[in-house]
Curated annotation (Swiss-Prot):
Protein name: Orotidine 5'-phosphate decarboxylase
Gene responsible for this protein: pyrF
Family: Belongs to the OMP decarboxylase family. Type 1 subfamily.
CDD domains membership: OMP_decarboxylase_like
GO CC terms of this entry: cytosol
Lineage, highest ranks first: Bacteria, Pseudomonadati, Pseudomonadota, Gammaproteobacteria, Enterobacterales
Amino acid sequence: MTLTASSSSRAVTNSPVVVALDYHNCDDALSFVDKIDPRDCRLKVGKEMFTLFGPQFVRELQQRGFDIFLDLKFHDIPNTAAHAVAAAADLGVWMVNVHASGGARMMTAAREALVPFGKDAPLLIAVTVLTSMEASDLADLGVTLSPADYAERLAALTQKCGLDGVVCSAQEAVRFKQVFGQEFKLVTPGIRPQGSEAGDQRRIMTPEQALAAGVDYMVIGRPVTQSVDPAQTLKAINASLQRSA
């Protein structure tokens, strides 16, 4: 992977890989991070780690050269969501997300909160349908649409509100690229190299399949974080993606 110029101290990578950090111990997380290269991936920090370790943990990762996807899935009244997104921008993260099911007014308020940050604003992404959810889960909530149809409806609302893209399953990516265009970014969890276990993600795909489907950023967790050689695993994934491009 190659580096491009950055106005910050952080490296910028053109790899589509985002490694999901899921650690209960800060030292263990940093020990893992120190084994990998910020030119090979970005990092995702979710609710558990951010609650445990706070903004300073994000700064520690940024000081090591990594761009951060702050995966907190804000879902609140418009004013509160807007302030939360602005706080994430102040922290200097690369990407932040909200729940599309929070509605148009909430998403619009979040987008408008980033206007003062200009080119330094993070990408603002909306979550459609969690990849662990199946049709039966949606039915329990009173949603009669299939996961794919419901995700597309929420993605259309997201684009209408002017956000940068959505989190979606890899299976939805092909249609979403056709419907919403190349500039609408698709972020996909549940990506696992061939031979990895499915874990708690129901709708999964390999990195090569995800790239072919139109995924812009692919989130990979345990296949990298639990690898005996995570640096080599990342390089192998990126090499396979370059061959597939």
